[in-house]
């Protein structure tokens, strides 16, 4: 038994090391790749200082943090709701951020700065989160709380559709492209949003013990002495914050929060002590690679990164499911 535990521990360490190397390689490739390839030796030349340090580095850091946040959010939701299909957009938090953003564009008549739009997106996500917490205080079951989140997401999606359909604003139509996900407008002015993600990411990665209890189910978690109501509220709030900041940075991006945790579980990473940091590394790597494809696929334009993640990720996910079933 002890030998099996040690073998599993060594395997987990190898997985984390491999994911760390993959993320580092993806990060370096993201800094080098673009309309102009800039090798490591040219990073400190005048051309490298402009393209690498001023343009590509803030975008790369944003992609890394958003990928980690979305993947961890997916892992938290899948444990919290005992549903492998749970993901950050399921509770309506992403759509709530979109409603906040569209309201800011309409009320500000397209004149608000980017930082104000970001704050409105976060506010929209947090409002949906507060509504969910209100439902949670009524001690609803996990399945009913999940259904409440789905209903809120549908309402927010309808509000966005009505607002965009009846709008003649060019900015609002461009906002539809932004809601498909993209990092084209990210620079150092959005560094405050990146910093807002880091403490929550680190805190959740340290909560493996309650996460492991939640993954056992509500009844088992209560029997083990876990204050279920408290942890459900805290984790929903933390997830709402991460998703709101991510949408403010890059728009709505699918696939990462749904598939990355599921893929890692299929690979044998079920303990949240390994799964949470593994999701952060794998989510960051996957989104970095998707962002590189989005930048380089077309010569004169940039693809929405949400389209890239779905196109590349869905076949891999189906293949892994078929392989696991065998």
UniProtKB/Swiss-Prot annotation:
Membrane topology: Multi-pass membrane protein
Top-rank taxon: Bacteria
Keyword Zinc-finger attached: no
Main location, first listed in the record: membrane
Keywords: Cell inner membrane, Cell membrane, Membrane, Transmembrane, Transmembrane helix, Transport
InterPro entries xrefs: ABC_BtuC-like, ABC_transptr_BtuC, ABC_transptr_permease_BtuC
Keyword Cell membrane: yes
One Gene Ontology term, aspect cellular component: plasma membrane
GO biological process, one term: cobalamin transport
Stored Pfam families: FecCD (PF01032)
Gene Ontology molecular function terms on file: vitamin transmembrane transporter activity
Subcellular location: Cell inner membrane
TM helices/strands, residue ranges: 15-35, 61-81, 88-108, 112-132, 146-166, 184-204, 240-260, 274-294, 302-322
PANTHER family (UniProt xref): FERRIC ENTEROBACTIN TRANSPORT SYSTEM PERMEASE PROTEIN, VITAMIN B12 IMPORT SYSTEM PERMEASE PROTEIN BTUC
The family this protein is said to belong to: Belongs to the binding-protein-dependent transport system permease family. FecCD subfamily.
Primary role: Part of the ABC transporter complex BtuCDF involved in vitamin B12 import. Involved in the translocation of the substrate across the membrane.
Subunit structure: The complex is composed of two ATP-binding proteins (BtuD), two transmembrane proteins (BtuC) and a solute-binding protein (BtuF).
Annotated protein name in UniProt: Vitamin B12 import system permease protein BtuC
The organism of origin for this protein: Shigella boydii serotype 18 (strain CDC 3083-94 / BS512)
